[in-house]
């Protein structure tokens, strides 16, 4: 078990379970304001690198939405640089973004909700197009496949969810 948590107890963190010992473990991305929140851990193996990532949520207000949008820009730059030396990347985690209308139970009513904002979805599209495959959607095009449900109003039982968790694989793998 390899893990990296936020300095604030109970706030956020990431982990990777592996039976294989990695060649290298990288904690964080080197940007202090994100590393304080335990957002990234990466394990490098002989043939690939696996990253667990936890993107910020913007749902608590404008300040956190701005933080999230800055994170998205910085994360893209970080991954673009990383791909130059570690091209065989597998990025797993909570992106706090529903990529397409199929990934959310009610796209119309959530059109202006953090996690499904047009600018977030556009970022996700461009990020995937920069060299990744959404491994779940590659094999499963069915609607109503979610990874998160609100605790309110029995959302899980009604399958009123959001698909915000992704396993993105370098497209040449």
Where would I find each of the regions flagged by the language model?
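Conserved beta strand-loop-helix elements of the APE1-like EEP
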Residues: 9-25, 143, 155-173
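Short, solvent-exposed loop/turn segments at secondary-structure junctions
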Residues: 8-9, 22, 55-60, 96-98, ...
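Short beta-strand and adjacent tight-turn residues that come in two discontinuous sequence segments
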Residues: 3, 137, 169
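Surface-exposed cleft-lining segments at the edges of enzyme active sites
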Residues: 31, 56-72, 108-112
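Structured beta-strand-rich core segments of catalytic domains in phosphoester-bond hydrolases
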Residues: 1-58
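Metal-dependent phosphoesterases centered on the DNase I-like endonuclease/exonuclease/phosphatase
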Residues: 73-164
């Amino acid at each position: 078990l390899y893990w990296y948590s936020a300095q604030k107890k109970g706030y956020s963190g990431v982990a990777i379970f592996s039976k294989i010992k990695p060649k290298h473990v990288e904690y964080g991305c080197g940007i202090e304001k994100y590393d304080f929140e335990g957002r990234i851990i990466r394990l490098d193996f002989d043939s690939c690198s696996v990253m667990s990532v936890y993107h910020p949520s913007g749902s608590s207000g404008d300040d956190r939405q701005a933080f999230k949008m800055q994170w998205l820009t910085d994360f893209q730059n970080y991954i673009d640089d990383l791909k130059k030396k570690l091209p065989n990347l597998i990025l797993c985690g909570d992106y706090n973004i529903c990529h397409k209308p199929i990934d959310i139970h009610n796209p119309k009513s959530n059109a202006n909700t953090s996690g499904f904002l047009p600018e977030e979805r556009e970022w996700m599209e461009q990020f995937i197009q920069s060299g990744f495959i959404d491994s779940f959607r590659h094999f499963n095009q069915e609607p109503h496949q979610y990874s998160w449900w609100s605790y309110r109003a029995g959302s899980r039982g009604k399958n009123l969810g959001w698909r915000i968790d992704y396993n993105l694989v370098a497209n040449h793998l």
